[in-house]
């Protein structure tokens, strides 16, 4: 397996090194994105043109827009390569994000679940590695649940529950059914930033939520 984790850093997100033809790019590893998205300038560097097909896509804020599509010849990640990948194309301004420290969002591409789900991945926070290899199963043989993104089963208060893993989010989000299960719920104003739009909202939150994963808290 080849480590393709990028050295780029932004808000504890994961970034990978991508090779498209003779062009190198940095992509956000985003299991919450149904399709891979690239910036208009990256499409230009690839000397590719958008297609006539337009698809509707939403971001973290629920904003839905119509985006052009394009087919890029290949996406290479480490030693694996996906041919003829259809992607969404968005304006460069949609990637113009910065954090509280003034660091600039380093990616010009969102690597979506349409590509990620085709391969086998191994992540180690300790070793700072995200490795990829060919999968024993094709994307067509994934269960209906997994086709929407990876699922884990953490434990809270002695009970397991299903949670979807979205590596494009910087925080965990709970459904409304948790209101009656959690103590000390507070509210704060926060900015929800996503590709294409951001907004300030007053949201409930808990400072500490103890979950167990495979007998580890």
Where are each of the predicted segments found?
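Pepsin/retropepsin-fold aspartyl endopeptidases
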Residues: 1-217
């Amino acid at each position: 397996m080849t480590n393709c984790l990028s050295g780029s850093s932004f808000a504890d997100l994961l970034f990978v090194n991508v090779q498209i033809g003779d062009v190198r790019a940095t992509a956000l590893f985003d299991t919450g994105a149904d399709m891979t998205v690239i910036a208009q300038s990256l499409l230009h560097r690839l000397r590719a043109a958008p297609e006539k097909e337009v698809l509707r896509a939403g971001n973290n804020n629920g904003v839905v827009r119509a985006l052009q599509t394009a087919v890029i010849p290949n996406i290479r990640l480490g030693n694996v390569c996906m041919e003829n990948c259809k992607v969404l194309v968005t304006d460069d301004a949609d990637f113009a994000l910065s954090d509280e420290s003034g660091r600039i969002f380093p990616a010009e591409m969102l690597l979506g679940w349409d590509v990620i789900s085709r391969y086998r991945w191994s992540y180690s926070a300790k070793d700072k590695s995200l490795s990829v290899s060919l999968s024993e199963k094709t994307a067509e043989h994934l269960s209906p649940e997994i086709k929407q993104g990876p699922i884990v089963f953490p434990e809270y208060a002695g009970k397991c529950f299903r949670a979807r893993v979205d590596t494009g989010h910087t925080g965990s989000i709970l459904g409304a059914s948790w209101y009656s299960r959690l103590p000390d719920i507070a509210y704060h104003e926060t900015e929800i930033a996503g590709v294409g739009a951001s907004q300030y909202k007053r949201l409930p939150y808990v400072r500490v939520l103890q979950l167990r994963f495979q007998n580890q808290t």
